[in-house]
């Protein structure tokens, strides 16, 4: 949680030692500063108001003090310019503004389940995380199976649409497979996208989207 000269020098020493021993690093609690150019074994950095902050987020008035969904569609435009981002996504307990509250024992996220799932494609994170309890992932097997098969590095990235603080749509290719994810703030929205990166002909897709009751139960989703 520091970035003074002593800490940065120490980070370089740790990275060099880890490289000699063929180890990779995730500098949690430290914002990116370009070290991965010299030491590509440094895979990720925190430097972001990530999911863990939900555990102690206070309520003010009719909702949480911090608007996390808006932050989630702001950080990729700004913070990710500096490098990969260890947000630690993957909450399986999800809540809308009206029923969200900070809780260390039973933490939850702001926004929908699919909002969390989309982070695994939209956020650059060569070393990715599953931040929730293992037993919750066992209970939510369709969600877990989908997250598990998303690559952490890609061959091609395209920004399809977005407005800072409002929404974003990203398509990423690994081999011959495209992964497309969209995230929004609290505002629901419909978008029309041009998928001209796909070859001519027919294509198969697995889709996850907010369910019809997601405005009341944020864990609700539909798979097609």
Segment roles from a protein language model:
Residues 22-29, 52-57, 126-137, 154-158, ...:
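Acidic/polar loop patches that form or flank catalytic/metal-binding clefts of enzymes
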Residues 1-107:
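Aromatic- and carboxylate-enriched substrate-binding clefts and catalytic-loop regions
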Residues 1-4, 27-30, 47, 133, ...:
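Active-site proximal loops enriched in glycine and acidic residues that flank catalytic Cys/His/Asp
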Residues 114, 118-160:
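Catalytic cores of secreted or luminal carbohydrate-active enzymes
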Residues 164-203:
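Carbohydrate-binding surface patches
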Residues 25, 122, 180:
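Conserved, mostly hydrophobic/aromatic
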Residues 2-6, 32-37, 94-96, 129-131, ...:
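Flexible loop/turn segments at secondary-structure boundaries
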